């Protein structure tokens, strides 16, 4: 029994179909409210950027008429971009989709659109999961009919950086690391490489070639222990696991021969050779006017010649068989004849 008053109610079929409203209860009041029929939200896809241009559609699983589980990377921003497909025969003019509990719920999400953001859905740069309930609402009538669809958002781990090195220098990843890419290639003439993965968020378990490691810690991998693909590249898997989900990055290592490169130069000239990662490489032999370096065939290097501290000559080159380079001595004339500075009154 209810005392006379105004009440709010929400009735459902125990699944996803609801009707709600307010009712003034007096003696003898009877409530008659009809639940919505059919399935208004046929399917939901999710992207993490406008129009899904960069990352495409996120993986989904365990999908039913009332809910679905979506794998959202930890680097996602707070807003998601859902694509709501209406059920057959749904009046999309009068039935619109909203985020339940959204204080700005007066803004409907468009049907079949990848451009309307579902704001404040997840935390940025986080492995924290979230549930978001969406409602397809039919406006008009005495009471509001609506159907719910729950987005279970499971966060997946990612790297913020990935580095490789051998015993000589750092190795250049191709392409440069980005969270849009999961496969990289490096080249080395050595039998071991060191892989250093850095996770974006704490809490992810990391393995490199099956060896457990911490974020930011290098792992030494023997190439002889690695599987090879059809192109004879050695495959090093880097696996991150969190929230029961694993994400795999692959480093493909091209084993190349090393080749001697000779740099001839004037006596007293300071010559250094750097890898593409900026590491200084020591010569295997030096006579004072000729330095020999064992470099990885086909990889790029730069020499920097210095005379009297302030004068330099620089040149980039790929290591080639039988290569001998003559390093020029920098011009030591002073091209800058004067330098002055003064204060400027920047007040308006």
Language model segments and positions:
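Short, acidic Ser/Thr/Gly-rich low-complexity loop/linker segments typical of extracellular
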Residues: 1, 62-64, 274-295
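Beta-rich interaction/scaffold domains
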Residues: 2-6, 11-269, 276, 311-312, ...
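Amphipathic, non-membrane alpha-helical rod segments
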Residues: 11, 291, 295-298, 303-311
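Disulfide-rich extracellular modules and peptides
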Residues: 35-37, 282, 307
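Extended non-catalytic scaffold regions that mediate assembly and binding
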Residues: 280, 325-327
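Intrinsic-disorder/low-complexity linker and hinge segments
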Residues: 329-333
């Amino acid at each position: 029994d209810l005392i006379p008053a105004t009440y709010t109610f929400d009735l459902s079929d125990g699944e996803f179909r609801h009707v709600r409203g307010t009712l003034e209860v007096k003696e003898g009041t009877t409530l008659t409210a009809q639940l919505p029929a059919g399935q208004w939200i046929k399917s939901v896809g999710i992207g993490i950027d406008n129009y899904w241009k960069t990352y495409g559609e996120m993986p989904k699983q365990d999908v039913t008429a009332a809910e679905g589980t979506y794998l959202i990377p930890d680097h996602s921003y707070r807003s998601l971009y859902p694509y709501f497909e209406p059920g057959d025969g749904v009046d999309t003019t009068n039935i619109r989709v909203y985020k339940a509990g959204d204080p700005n719920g007066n803004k409907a999400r468009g049907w079949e659109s990848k451009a309307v953001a579902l704001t404040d859905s997840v935390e940025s740069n986080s492995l924290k999961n979230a549930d978001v309930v969406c409602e397809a609402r039919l406006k008009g009538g005495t009471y509001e009919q609506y159907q719910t669809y729950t987005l279970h958002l499971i966060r997946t781990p990612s790297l913020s950086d990935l580095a490789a090195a051998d015993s000589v220098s750092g190795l250049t990843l191709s392409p440069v690391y980005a969270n849009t890419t999961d496969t990289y290639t490096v080249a080395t003439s050595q039998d071991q490489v060191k892989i250093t993965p850095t996770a974006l968020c704490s809490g992810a378990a990391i393995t490199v070639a099956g060896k457990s490691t911490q974020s930011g810690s290098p792992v030494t991998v023997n190439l002889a222990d690695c599987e090879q693909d059809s192109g004879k590249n050695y495959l090093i898997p880097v696996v991150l696991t969190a929230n029961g989900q694993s994400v795999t990055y692959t480093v493909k290592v091209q084993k190349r021969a090393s080749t001697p490169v000779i740099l001839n130069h004037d006596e007293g000239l300071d010559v250094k050779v750097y890898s593409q990662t900026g590491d200084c490489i020591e010569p295997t032999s030096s006579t004072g006017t000729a330095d020999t370096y064992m470099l990885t065939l086909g990889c790029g290097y730069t020499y920097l010649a210095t005379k009297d501290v302030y004068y330099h000559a620089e040149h980039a080159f790929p290591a080639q068989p039988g290569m001998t380079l003559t390093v020029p001595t920098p011009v030591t004339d002073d091209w800058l004849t004067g330098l002055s500075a003064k204060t400027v009154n920047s007040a308006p």
